[in-house]
Amino acid sequence: MNNNAQPDVSALSFEQAVEELERIVSALERGDVALDKSIEIYERGEALKKHCEALLKAAEDRIEKIRLDRAGRPQGVEPLDAE
């Protein structure tokens, strides 16, 4: 995994970032990567994890639920976890 050939983490979709993160975890678990390379891909994995968390947070912030009045009629929307 050469950092020069890799796309910028922020340019990856959630699915692309998760897929690359899974490859990194697999390589580290196998233990057949040199120490310097392990550190390099671990750091990339940390960046991918943070990117995925940010994308998930943004998606959660966009999800809303319909608020109903006492008669059950739609009254507006509110954040999904507001109660």
Swiss-Prot record:
InterPro entries: Exonuc_VII_S, Exonuc_VII_ssu_sf. GO terms for molecular function: exodeoxyribonuclease VII activity. One of its GO terms (biological process) is DNA catabolic process. The keyword Nuclease applies. Signal peptide: none annotated. It holds the Pfam family Exonuc_VII_S. Gene3D superfamilies: Exonuclease VII, small subunit. Its main location: cytoplasm. It catalyses: Exonucleolytic cleavage in either 5'- to 3'- or 3'- to 5'-direction to yield nucleoside 5'-phosphates. It is an enzyme of class 3 (hydrolase). It is found in: Cytoplasm. The keyword Cytoplasm applies. GO terms for cellular component: cytosol; exodeoxyribonuclease VII complex. Keywords: Cytoplasm, Exonuclease, Hydrolase, Nuclease. Bidirectionally degrades single-stranded DNA into large acid-insoluble oligonucleotides, which are then degraded further into small acid-soluble oligonucleotides. Heterooligomer composed of large and small subunits. Belongs to the XseB family. This is Exodeoxyribonuclease 7 small subunit. It comes from Rhizobium meliloti (strain 1021) (Ensifer meliloti). The lineage of its organism: Bacteria, Pseudomonadati, Pseudomonadota, Alphaproteobacteria, Hyphomicrobiales. The gene is xseB.
